[in-house]
Amino acid sequence: MKGQKIMTEVKRHVEIAGYGVCLPKNTVQFKDQTRHRVVENEETQLDLAEAAIQAALENANLSMKDIDCLVSASAVGVQPIPCTAALIHERVAKGLSIPAMDINTTCTSFISALSTMSHLIEAGEYRRVLIVSSEVGSLGLNSKQKESYELFSDGAAAFIFQSSDKDKGVIASLQRTWSEGAHDTEIRGGLTAYQPKEYSEETKTNFMFDMKGKKILLL
């Protein structure tokens, strides 16, 4: 707008070297909406992640030996321990000492990972970073909660970011947290709030995805 200074200076010089995606073969139809959903015991979260990573490496004409850090940025991991990145590392980088870590802020995990890792690339800590988001959220959805059950697809996407000597990259990033909505989108069970040993038919909804969509929109 007139009189306002527009921020255009590149702060973090990173570029996309390659990317890849993987969607489950199975689809589910909700009226005119198509969702990709895994079939339980046929495709896993790790399968999707591995396929997306291999596609990204091929797209970039690189191998895992060219990657300095592997980041898993998924809303929900494979299991509490170890981190999902370690399990993905076992699939795609076994025998290599590439550091692997999770960056998790649920639905905004990829954005958080890119923001964080772009700083480390700019600082010279890493030259090339692979970020993968892999989701099979359908396995934890409550079929009785229509607003969430019909909303999500499963799938994976992987991007390889690398340092750049060109004037392009991240201009700015901004994140905010409104914790008054912390309990409007949650899976309560599985860790220390509701431990796995507490699972029963009566408590099973605590181990499913629960979303108060309209309330979130009004935050």
Question: Which residues does each predicted region cover?
Answer:
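Condensing-enzyme catalytic core mediating Claisen C-C bond formation in acyl metabolism
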Residues: 2-43, 145-219
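Beta-strand segments within the central parallel beta-sheet cores of soluble alpha/beta enzyme folds
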Residues: 18, 65-73, 99-104, 126-134, ...
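Conserved catalytic cysteine-centered active-site region
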Residues: 39-47, 74-129
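Phosphate/pyrophosphate-binding loops at sites that engage ATP/ADP/AMP, CoA/4′-phosphopantetheine
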Residues: 52-68
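Acidic, glycine-rich active-site loops and adjacent beta-strand->loop/helix elements
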Residues: 13, 73-78, 105-108, 133-138, ...
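Flexible, glycine-rich active-site loops centered on histidine and acidic residues
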Residues: 122-156
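Short acidic, glycine/serine/threonine-rich loops at helix termini
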Residues: 27-28, 81-83, 141-144
